[in-house]
């Protein structure tokens, strides 16, 4: 209300020409008042153009001598100036930057607060203007809605910012993991190549050692042969240069010895018969390595289960087993093969575990069917798939074998009339019999292809008597298939596929090469891991994925 009163008063004491508070106001006959400077300037301008003097507002003529000072308006204008220049009033009311007046109006078209002089200017003429108090509530509500909307957008923006940071961190971790995996994969590839290089160099060193040793022996033989001939030549020269008696002394014996002299040629090595170095099949090696990586995805946590009676000792963490001699009866020979089962048993799915057999001279490992098998095996003849055992083993430090079923009908087979190959084929009612026919002991030295991609070299089957000291030619002894490996396994991987009915063994030491695979296994009961340290005091240890 006070603002409106001040506004009305200010309008009354404002010069219509300069639109400022009256300065030395002069009143005309018509009653309008103007600043002395403003009306004087207007008087000169109107006289110049029109030849007469008239009020700038109502155009009523006036005489210059009739202009009279208006002290009352001058006092009011002066008081208003004092109010406008008051610090308290200046703090309460914002003022127009152009006119210095209070900003009491709101222009809807421009959306700005203006003073009353701005409202009368050409810029805002015809615009809808309202008192600030009238529109403040309306725009306060609008701004409140806008504030809530912006706060929600700010929350959304902060969430998006957090999502971006989270995604950035996730990608960084993922890329770091990829870098780690790439470094690990290429390190493993380099390790494979380094291993192959080391093997090739070792083979060359062995070849060099054997070759030079043989040639050195040949050189010694040639030196002795040359010395012997020099002695004979010297004897002949002495006889020919000496007396008749010396010439004829034991002449027949000398001639006989000379005739018996045979020139021994040194043992040589033809270069074309040397083993030719071939670059490793990197593609094949990578395939083998890939297969090992695939089966290692099914790593199972296996622990060892003690058996009774037993000549084995299991560690506290149930991950290591070793042979222990029966101290209370040292003179009694063990009548069974000591072994332990692993836990858990498997009835479905794929499962993989690895066993450290470093430096052991004998061991047996694989899987067995629980209801058919026992941990302590009465005899070697029990290690057969038909008895529930699918195992491989090492004996005598370097003889690796896979234990297959004995072939029926072939134990006492004796070929006649040099026709053993054909007769063997007629009697081969399964692949085992067919395989056993093609052996060097049966005059067959062959390789073959089976089931499109299974290549085999046919070797003599190992007898049971070759496995253990003593003589045992029982017809039920297992067929022991020799396993030939360029690198002796220090770590063996076992992969059980219950659905495919297969048990596979991998040489982890040799970059995952397949050692042997049992196919078409019949698992009618839960299948358990099997371990036998044999009569070797060094332990067998279950490995962890990180070891």
From Swiss-Prot:
It catalyses: S-ubiquitinyl-[E2 ubiquitin-conjugating enzyme]-L-cysteine + [acceptor protein]-L-lysine = [E2 ubiquitin-conjugating enzyme]-L-cysteine + N(6)-ubiquitinyl-[acceptor protein]-L-lysine. It holds the Pfam family zf-RING_UBOX. A zinc finger (RING-type) spans 15-59. It is an enzyme of class 2 (transferase). Residues 186-199 are annotated as: Required for interaction with GABARAP and for autophagy. Its main location: cytoplasm. This is Tripartite motif-containing protein 5. The lineage of its organism: Eukaryota, Metazoa, Chordata, Craniata, Vertebrata.
